[in-house]
Amino acid sequence: NSAKISYGELHQFTYLLNEPLLNKEGEVLQNTQTVHTQSYIFRNDGKEPATNVELIFNYAPMYLNVWPSRLFAEKSDSSRRYVMVFDYLAPKETIRCEVLAINTQIPMLLSVRCKEGVAQNMVLMPQKVFHPAFINSL
């Protein structure tokens, strides 16, 4: 009976924008732009709190959103990797992390761990939701 962190990638997408990238003088640098998004979910599936939950990215994301809104510390390790540290994740608590980058790649999520252990990666797939009446008739 301890903390058990799991995480997975909910989705990712690349938008191709038909908007030119301009320099300060208004000259076109690129005819189109790209916006990359990636969404992760983190969950404590255990029966005890997870403490010092660390999300380690290859480098700091251009834009980052955490939902529900949570306070976290930002650090970098000796290799200048970007580390987000959440002090606490309650049993059955879930947080999402959305990353966005414009005209550049999104940093890779390298590691997820907490004081109680290393997180387990879970593969997520879209699933059709059936009406309860249909399920109960089986």
State what each model feature region is.
Residues 40, 55-57, 84, 97-99, ...:
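Preference for bulky hydrophobic residues occupying beta-strand positions
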Residues 69-105:
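Intrinsically disordered, low-complexity Pro/Gly/Ser/Thr-rich segments with frequent PxxP/GP/PP motifs
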Residues 27, 36, 40-49, 54-59:
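Asparagine-centered strand-capping/turn motif at beta-strand->loop junctions
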Residues 2-22, 91, 98-138:
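Terminal connector regions
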Residues 50-75, 114-115:
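Short acidic, flexible loop segments centered on an aromatic residue
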Residues 31-33, 46, 88:
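Sterically constrained small-residue positions within well-ordered secondary structures
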Residues 15-35:
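Short, solvent-exposed beta-strand/turn "edge" segments of beta-rich domains on protein surfaces
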Residues 33-37, 50-52, 79, 94-96:
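A general secondary-structure signal for short beta-strands and their flanking turns/coil
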